[in-house]
Amino acid sequence: MERTFVYLKPNAVRRGLVGEIIKRFEQRGIKIVALKLLWMSKQQAEKLYEMHKGKSFYNDLIDFVTGGPIVAMIVEAPRVIEMVRHIIGDTDPLKAGTGTIRGEFALTITKNLIHASDSKENFEREYKIFFSDDEIIDYYLDVQDDI
């Protein structure tokens, strides 16, 4: 099984889309193994987005993601990184496909509702910003019989 880090940005929480987004993952057999509601600190945001430091959008992005509560989670399934990226759609909502989370609900590139790790290496770096290993719960999901 593969794992990835996902977080729902403040606008997803404020717009009441948390349940809808989680439902889309669960309907695809994706198992949530860690989940928390929190207010991202500036330090966490700067660490998460360190590769964008110095870019024109960096300060606005940091202000946005620290401006309200987020839902952070670790999810698990075979090929989950690829699957989650497909479900959420392109970073730019105008390029995100119909039926994707960003294609249906996102308004701008920065305020695109959701972040997901794009590689195993980034998952390993990103989840540790928000979770300790003892917060990850391993359990059996009935849908695993169908995988």
Curated annotation (Swiss-Prot):
Protein name: Nucleoside diphosphate kinase
Catalytic-site annotation from UniProt: H115
Signal peptide annotation: none
Co-factor requirement: Mg(2+)
Location(s) in or outside the cell: Cytoplasm
Its EC number(s): 2.7.4.6
Reaction equations catalysed: a 2'-deoxyribonucleoside 5'-diphosphate + ATP = a 2'-deoxyribonucleoside 5'-triphosphate + ADP; a ribonucleoside 5'-diphosphate + ATP = a ribonucleoside 5'-triphosphate + ADP
Chief place of localization: cytoplasm
Function of the molecule: Major role in the synthesis of nucleoside triphosphates other than ATP. The ATP gamma phosphate is transferred to the NDP beta phosphate via a ping-pong mechanism, using a phosphorylated active-site intermediate.
Record-listed ATP binding positions: K9, F57, R85, T91, R102, N112
Top-level taxon: Bacteria
Keyword Metal-binding recorded: yes
CDD domains listed in its UniProt record: NDPk_I (cd04413)
Any single GO CC term annotated in Swiss-Prot or TrEMBL for this entry: cytoplasm
Subunit structure: Homotetramer.
Organism: Thermosipho africanus (strain TCF52B)
GO terms under biological process: CTP biosynthetic process; GTP biosynthetic process; UTP biosynthetic process
